[in-house]
Amino acid sequence: MRARLMLTSAALLLTAAGPSWQQRALSSAAPSTDKANHEWARAIVSGDPDVLSAPYEEHGIFIGPDGSVSVGKAAVRAIYASRPASVRVLKADIRSDGRAAPDPDDVYEWGTAEITVQRGAAIKEASGRYLTVWHHNGARWVITRNIAF
């Protein structure tokens, strides 16, 4: 009886000490999410639609702050490629405020993006929240849903 109790206690201790599947999913997704955020801040300034759409899954969905919906990586690329030449992004930053793993292959990320835009002589600073669903697709983590508020 005592041996069984010790064995059960040891099993519980080892289970608690090991990383949970949630932590494994978050750790696995982190390099992709961090890279995409870093590249977004640079590419939104330079206006590079290929870099901006790169993390999206082929049928990923982007919902803009105005409620517009773009379905597919090509449509997301087209949004970024359509920025008028008269609009310049002077500065951009993105901050991930949190991440959660609802299952081993999905990670929800939320945060804040800040941007400084020049239209003609007018310069405007804005910030907005975002919620992104990342999905583990084979060897990659890709965006399947992205909502900009």
Locate each region found by the language model.
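Bacterial N-terminal signal peptides that target proteins for export
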Residues: M1-L7
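Short, low-complexity N-terminal intrinsically disordered segments enriched in polar/charged residues
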Residues: R4, L13-E58
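Short beta-strand edge/turn micro-motifs at domain boundaries
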Residues: W21, S127-F149
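Hydrophobic pocket/interface hotspot
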Residues: W40, L52-S53, G60, G72, ...
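A mature extracytoplasmic/lumenal domain signature
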Residues: Y56, D66, G111-A113, I147
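Short solvent-exposed beta->alpha transition segments
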Residues: Y56-R88
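Solvent-exposed strand-loop boundary residues in beta-sheet-rich modules
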Residues: D66, R119-A121, G138
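Surface-exposed, charged secondary-structure patches
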Residues: R77-I123
